[in-house]
Structure formats: C-alpha cells, structure tokens
Amino acid sequence: MEHTNSNDSAVNGTAQPQVPFEVFKALPKTDLHVHLDGSLRLETILELAKAEKVELPANDIEGLRAAIGCGSNFGSLVEYLRGFDITLRVMQTEAALERIAFELAEDAHRENVRYMEVRYAPMLHTQRGLKLTKVVEAVLDGLRRARETYGIKATVIICGIRNISAESSYQMAELAVAYKGRGVVGFDLAGAEADFPAKHHRAAFQLVRDNNINCTIHAGEAYGPESIAQAIHVCGAHRIGHGCRLREDGDLMQYLNDHRVPLECCPSSNVQTGAVKDLASHPLKLYFDLGLRVTVNTDNRLITDTSVSKELYLVHTQMGVPFADIKSMILAGFKSSFQPFHEKQAALRRVGVELDKYDDHGVLLTSQNGTSSERSSRRPRGSAELVADAE
C-alpha cells in the first residue's frame, strides 16, 4: 500500500502539533531531482571565479546571492533558469566539476541524505574545450570521493536540453549509454518546456531504452498535462519531473497512478517558477491522497535556497501533510530510485527500521542508548507495507 489516510487538522478540525525541523534533518532521505549546476556553494563560485579569472556580476556573497536570485519568486521557468548563466561560468574545468560534485554530496550528507541522483547536461560544461568524457568523469570522481569520505551514495542522470537540439540530446544519450554501470543511472530531458516538446527528442530516448537505461523527463512544470502524456507515451519516461499540471487531466493521472509512475515533486522551486501560486495550492498533497507515488526533492539547492529537510518541513507545515505520510514519501523516494532492485530492497529495509523509531507525531520511540521506550510497541503506519513492496 502506497500511503496512509492520515487525517490532518484541516480534515478533523483538531490542531496537530508541528514536528520540529530538526527531526526532518535527522531522518534518512533521498534527493532524486537535483541539478548540479543549480546546487553550488556561493563561496565556491567566488573562489573558483577568482582562481580562474572569471567575471561575475558581484564579488561578495550577498551581491552574488542577489544576482542569482537565490530563493526568489521569478514568476516563470525562463527567468528562473537565468541564474544558471552565472553558475556555469565556473563549471568549465575538471577540477571545478570534481569539487562541486563532491561539495553537493557533502552538503546532502550533512542533512542525512543517503542516496541522491545528480543530474546535469555535460555539453554545458564544454565552453572552454573540455571533452564530454572528461566532464562526466570529473563529476563521477567527485561523487565517488564523497562516498568514500561520507558513505553517501550519489549517482548521475545525464540530461539533454529541450531548447538546444535533438542532435545534442542524442549525443548526451550516447554518453549515458557509454557510462551505464559506471555511475550513470539515467537520462533526462530538461530546459525550457513551452515550445520545445519532448517528442522532438524521441530518438535519444529510444537509444537509452534500447540499452535498458532508466529515463525521467521534466514535464507538466511550465506546460500542460499533454507534456506529461508525451513524456510517458512517446518517450517512455519511467518518472516525471515536477508534474504540477497533471491534476488537469484526471484520466492521465489515473494512468500514472495505475502504473506507479513516480512524481519528482520540488515544491519550493515550483512556487519560484510560477508553476503554482504558493505552497498551499501545490498539488503534492492531492496526488498523495489519491495514491500516486510522490517523492520530495530540492531541484536546485542554491537557486531555490533549499534542502531536502526544508522541503519536507514545508510539506508538513505549509501543506498540512501529516508526519506519518511524510515517512511514506521518504520511503517512496528510495523505492522510486534508479538503483538496482536488490540495493533498493536493502535500503528500504534499513530506512524502514529507522523511520519506525518515530511515532506518527515525530516523537522518537527509542532512547539514545538503543533501549525501547514503553511507547515503542506502537508501530508507525505505512513503513512495513512500503518496505515489503519495493517494486
């Protein structure tokens, strides 16, 4: 069973105490939708720019934050994407890419993210002549170093870009095939959605599917549900990035529900791009309550100014999602990952045990020395069912 029918205060009329942010930070988590070039540290951008003699719109932290618009409401996806013009300036060398990938995984580890899938478009990092293979290997090296240092497992999703060309996307798909089994676990199509339909990139997706590689597509973020239908039926996507406008097509929504197609929800980012008016009107809770497989992700840690812990906390406090359902969403993240099945099963078992240490109100049921409290006989809802069903 995918989720529990927990009542919140909006339903039963009783005020439920909010779970503290520190609890969300302590929980084991995934981040399945995070862009490398939108998730740098401001300090790193300044240091790399100075070392590489790269011009920036500002030379201090606050000025750079304002220039990128970290955490701002941009009003459209196109405006939101302008910040990448700044970050990409310092992402054109092997050393920079290795460092940035390592630091992203390090930041994720600090909030107890156990597994993440880092996505980026290698062709955007060749502005100074860096070979595509060197781009891919530098990022993989950084993520590998983070795993050796912290134990966090971070894999790669290679992206094509809607608004560049179908030929470029095919080249990125070839890279994904070349690095299959070497750290690359999937292929994606990102970029401006309106006027750049996924069907134009069908050949790239045919190539990755012919080579048994997982794929996800940004769809239903800045365009209607027909974009989602095209991603699923024309390109064969296994997951949908964002999917905010899926709610406009009930029949399609039922199809995704029936086929257990996961949604990579990125709530704060969706507000900032204008995909939704505010968090209260985000469809995430609707999707979950209808039984769809919902995961919670960052999108861009820097540009959105967020973390997985923050997103989960906002889903709980601003959308009224009960803590018991938050735990189900966390497990859905592990279940929806592009890990091999046996690794997914093992992760679900471990994480399920950890989540079961908390009751439905975020109260830790076991003491620090590992002994059970007298309340620990009450098992939190949903974990056992989700762990047992890793498909």
Regions found by a protein language model. Name each.
Residues E2-I213, A222-S227, V234-R239, R245-P262, ...:
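Metal-cofactor-binding active-site regions of metalloenzymes
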